Amino acid sequence: MFKKFKPVTPGTRQLVLPAFDELTRQGDLTGKRTRKSVRPNKKLSFFKKSSGGRDNLGHISCRHRGGGAKRLYRVIDFKRNKDGIEAKVVSVEYDPNRSAYIALLNYADGEKRYILAPKGIKRGDQVISGEGSPFKLGCCMTLKSMPLGSTVHNIEMRPHSGGKLVRSAGLAAQVIAKTPGYVTLKMPSGEFRMLNEGCRATIGEVSNADHNLCVDGKAGRKRWKGVRPTVRGTAMNPVDHPHGGGEGRHNGYIPRTPWGKVTKGLKTRDKRKSNKWIVKDRRK
């Protein structure tokens, strides 16, 4: 769910924000009447200094980054390798470091871990990992154990490497076919891809599916998130961009990146990279 605002100021005229109805509040845990959000688990979070888009030499490696509010990084369990032990969902929380929500699990042996929250999971639900796990929302198992047509997320590229694929808000892949040793998945991009049957995935769709409907409404909200302005190349000087300079407006060139490479239509995939695991390309 999301909420719109009355246009009482220019910044709220286009503003669309998530309603955060799925999140657990402090009042849910304490019984008091409060809408304050749950604080992150201290042992599973730490302060991570912002790079400001710079590499280890201080050079800009990613443009348009810098500033923004400080963030606590939450340690997420992408491997889901604690097998055979049931866990209870303590809370569903906001994470400023990703578009999806996260869920805090309390295992039967007392250990706590954060995972990506599947869509529809709520406080008090039970989840479990490993072979023989029930086919239930939030449970994790290998791809070979899942029936055809299953909706999955947080998928490993190689066994025991931890989830790498389908982790953003609202995404899900589908199990399409099984062959000896491999499972074919339909990815959110439309690509059909083969993966080792020993790779793990979590059942369900990633939470916060309305994330793509949100509108920041003003430049200042982008700055709070650590996003700096984007300047057009034609507004720069020739020393700064291939499009820079010229008396007045000039557009008699092929569009290029700030580093001089053709920016439209140029293939960037390494020709030596194998395509044998891609059954159907997303572009076809």
From Swiss-Prot:
Keywords: Ribonucleoprotein, Ribosomal protein, RNA-binding, rRNA-binding. One of its GO terms (cellular component) is large ribosomal subunit. Residues 232-284 are annotated as: Disordered. GO terms for molecular function: rRNA binding; structural constituent of ribosome; transferase activity. The keyword DNA damage does not apply. Residues 264-284 have a biased composition (Basic residues). Part of the 50S ribosomal subunit. Forms a bridge to the 30S subunit in the 70S ribosome. This is Large ribosomal subunit protein uL2. The lineage of its organism: Bacteria, Pseudomonadati, Chlamydiota, Chlamydiia, Chlamydiales.
